[in-house]
A protein has these predicted regions:
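Conserved HGGG/HGGXW glycine-rich cap/lid loop of the alpha/beta-hydrolase fold
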Residues: 26-79
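Flexible "cap/lid" loop of the alpha/beta hydrolase fold
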Residues: 121-125, 132-165
Length: 292
């Protein structure tokens, strides 16, 4: 794995506050970094599909002390409860509830990676009075005529592993990609496994993909057209899921231009490929969005 850099240890050892808030009869876990300070701007970080708040453990501290920062486990993922059915409205309500519980101000900017960007977009429309802007991280509204890379089918009974180490070794990024920073993938894997029944499994509802609504392409397109809050976009220059064609399609859906930045040498999981460059690019983007 090679030498793990000091900045990583400093980040993941940064203390954070933890809490749980109930939304529609389900517990939603959240964590927050930095002091509660009414004079300090706030960020709400939203993970991607099948992920969790700990994906941000080595990113959020890099934005201190300038922000109060919170992240959550969307229901159906991480350590939050599972639902029988999932929908964009309820996930958006979870973001608002966490922002309130974590003491984030009305100047909060949502930062959403991948599927988290989709939920962040809907939240920024549904709860425009509670938030101040949105930054999408390799997320957006794909050109419907552009083909998607193949992904493995999901659903059915959870795969059980005999021990935690075996489960961690089976962890894979989705969509599949290489990552030179193996220590980051290993850290995420260690926080992605739970004990269930007579074995270990990954922390997500395997029925999630077949029991959610409000997240179709037409829903995302409608939300992007309706978005009134300032928007910014970061994407991996080498991403399989975000292309210049999709960027052009998104610009065509908006009446006003919005700032974008292609992160060099980064794929879909851009803050795993280039964590330090991502933090700097995000800082710059947040300044642009806050000034819009």
């Amino acid at each position: 794995m090679g030498t793990i850099p000091d900045w990583f240890w400093a980040a993941v050892e940064t203390p954070y506050e933890e809490g749980v808030v109930e939304v529609d009869e389900c517990d939603v876990r959240w964590q927050a970094w930095g002091e509660r300070d009414a004079d300090k701007p706030s960020l709400l970080l939203v993970h991607g599909m099948f992920a969790h708040a700990h994906w941000w453990d080595f990113i959020a501290p890099g934005l201190l002390p300038d922000y109060r920062i919170a992240a959550l486990d969307l229901t159906g993922m991480g350590d939050s409860d599972y639902r029988y059915e999932y929908d964009a409205d309820t996930w958006a309500d979870e973001l608002r509830a966490v922002a309130d519980a974590a003491g984030l101000g009305d100047d909060t900017i949502i930062v959403g990676h991948s599927f988290g960007g989709r939920i962040g977009l809907h939240t920024a429309v549904r709860h425009a009075d509670r938030f101040a802007g949105l930054v999408l991280a390799d997320a957006g509204v794909r050109d419907p005529d552009e083909s998607l890379p193949e992904r493995p089918p999901m659903g059915g009974r959870p795969v059980l592993y005999p021990d935690e180490e075996t489960a961690r070794r089976r962890f894979r990024l989705q969509p599949a990609q290489s990552c030179a920073n193996e220590f980051l993938v290993e850290y995420i894997a260690r926080n992605s496994v739970m004990r269930i029944d007579d074995g270990f499994a990954f922390k997500f509802d395997t029925d999630l993909m077949t029991s959610m609504s409000g997240v179709a392409h037409e829903d995302a397109e409608r939300d992007l057209r309706a978005l009134a809050l300032p928007l910014g976009l970061l994407y991996g220059a080498d991403s399989e899921l975000f292309s210049e064609r999709t960027l052009g399609y998104m610009r065509g859906l908006r009446d006003a231009p919005f700032p974008t930045h292609a992160l060099a040498d980064a794929q879909h999981h851009l803050f795993l490929d280039q964590p330090l460059a991502f933090v700097e690019a995000l800082r710059t983007m947040l300044t642009a969005v806050r000034g819009a």
